[in-house]
Curated annotation (Swiss-Prot):
NCBIfam families: PRK00197.1, proA. One of its GO terms (biological process) is L-proline biosynthetic process. Transmembrane segments: none annotated. It comes from the Bacteria. It catalyses: L-glutamate 5-semialdehyde + phosphate + NADP(+) = L-glutamyl 5-phosphate + NADPH + H(+). It comes from Shewanella halifaxensis (strain HAW-EB4). InterPro entries: Ald_DH/histidinol_DH, Ald_DH_C, Ald_DH_N, Aldehyde_DH_dom, G-glutamylP_reductase_CS, Glu-5-SA_DH, GPR_dom. This is Gamma-glutamyl phosphate reductase. One of its GO terms (molecular function) is glutamate-5-semialdehyde dehydrogenase activity. It is found in: Cytoplasm. Belongs to the gamma-glutamyl phosphate reductase family. Keywords: Amino-acid biosynthesis, Cytoplasm, NADP, Oxidoreductase, Proline biosynthesis. Catalyzes the NADPH-dependent reduction of L-glutamate 5-phosphate into L-glutamate 5-semialdehyde and phosphate. The product spontaneously undergoes cyclization to form 1-pyrroline-5-carboxylate. Pfam families: Aldedh.
Length: 422
């Protein structure tokens, strides 16, 4: 079987499996997800062992610490993933809900009802937890899914999918509801992007190269996002002591994720006072800096290392313990910088002035905009959506963390009495 035949078979099997999934009741889907959680718990030793193989291979191949952190699925992280399944089980199932209903003048009773999308293709890189997150959300909403993870996590993904597929069978469903492309051949990605006869939506979770590839080659609707060049603006009326803890959380808690902070913008009135305090605190936590001219002068005078910031560095999603710092004249300067360099993911303002906060929220056109909060909150679990499929930075169909509703569409239902159009 060549690659085209292989992908066609995957698509056909997924489409066929999706029909039965779409008819499941909420109770049946909850039972399925509970079965998956129980089987993952029972198989945790095998799953962790498979992940250790991936981690060992990654280290042998010289992958970065950031990449290794992304692919790590130890027992603690795995149990967190399983806990998220419980959260999803507890969420309201949007499928079958009525969006609106009205009686038309022509006598038709017209309504819109939420239904599954059908088959979702997800292409992702070194995050094995995504395998479970996506499968669970897809199944909760009655969708079949075709997964294509990175070669770095192949052993982990195989172990996870084997367990999930066994749960499907034990619940009387086709194992083809969840399929994994386990061949690392890159041409299969291009082929999947053109499988529009069977796949209804593509979600790429990865870096700019993957996003660009999908945007350029797909003949299927693509949800773009996941690239997070995130900003925090420290306003003239910010509480500086509290600001340090927010910035630390946004930058240091988990620097390898898309909602981590990349650039902090500081009002000029605080520059000489606040930048040294912030930099000394963060440098003690391993953070290094790229600064504008004024920031460089301030930090150099304090004996702290700093590299010269450029447009290229400000346009970089660091995914590491690196932070850009820029002094701005006012709110307008902060907004101008964000508009130029943001990826449209998450931005925050720290201020005690409610009017300035409101102006910031109105001016910034990103998927998530915060006042006095860390950008790290842009997450399906934190938003009460359960695990997320992705964080969309586009505006059509879905924006921000994609939970259950983002995996549904709707259809029009019209009831008549042998009604004809006049």
């Amino acid at each position: 079987m060549n690659n085209d035949e292989y992908l066609t078979a995957l698509g056909q099997n997924a489409k066929q499996a999706s029909y039965a999934l779409a008819t499941l009741s909420g109770q049946q889907k909850s039972a399925l997800l509970r079965c998956i959680a129980d089987k993952l718990t029972a198989a945790k030793a095998d799953i962790v062992s498979a992940n250790q193989q991936d981690v060992a291979d990654a280290k042998a191949n010289g992958l970065s610490d950031a990449m290794i952190d992304r692919l790590l699925l130890d027992e603690t992280r795995l149990m967190g993933v399983i806990s998220d399944i419980d959260n999803v089980i507890g969420l309201t199932d949007p499928v079958g809900s009525e969006i609106d209903s009205r009686l038309l003048d022509n006598g038709l009773r017209l309504s819109r009802r939420r239904v599954p999308l059908g088959v979702i293709g997800v292409i992702y890189e070194a995050r094995p937890n995504v395998t479970v997150d996506i499968a669970v959300l897809a199944l909760k909403t009655g969708n079949a899914v075709i997964l294509r993870g990175g070669k770095e996590t192949l052993a982990s993904n195989k172990a996870l999918c084997t367990v999930i597929r066994s749960a499907m069978v034990s619940q009387g469903l086709s194992e083809d509801c969840v399929q994994l492309i386990d061949n690392p051949d890159r041409s299969l990605v291009s082929g999947l992007l053109k499988l529009d006869k069977y796949v209804d939506m593509i979600v790429p979770r990865g870096g700019q190269n993957l996003q660009r590839l999908c945007a350029e080659q797909a003949t299927i609707p693509v949800i773009l996002g996941g690239i997070g060049i995130c900003h925090i603006y420290v306003d003239a009326e910010a509480n500086l002591e509290k600001a340090v803890s927010v910035i630390e959380n946004a930058k240091v808690q988990r620097p390898t994720v898309c909602n981590a902070l990349d650039t902090v913008l500081i009002h000029q009135s605080h520059a000489k006072q606040f930048i040294p305090v912030l930099a000394k605190h963060l440098s003690g936590l391993g953070v290094n800096f790229y600064g504008c001219d004024q920031t460089q002068a301030i930090l150099t005078a304090e004996g702290l290392d700093v590299s010269a910031a450029t447009d290229e560095s400000f346009a970089t999603e660091w995914l590491s313990l690196t932070l850009g710092i820029r002094v701005v004249a006012d709110l307008d300067g902060a907004v101008e910088h964000i508009r130029q360099f943001s990826s449209g993911h998450s931005e925050s303002i720290l201020t005690d002035n409610i009017h300035t906060a409101s102006d910031f929220m109105n001016a910034i056109d990103s998927a998530a905009v915060y006042v006095n909060a860390s950008t790290r909150f842009t997450d399906g679990g934190e938003f009460g959506l359960g695990a997320e499929v992705a964080v969309s930075t586009q505006k059509l169909h879905a924006r921000g963390p994609m939970g259950l509703e983002a995996l549904t569409t709707y259809k029009w239902l019209a009831w008549g009495d042998y009604t004809i159009r006049g």
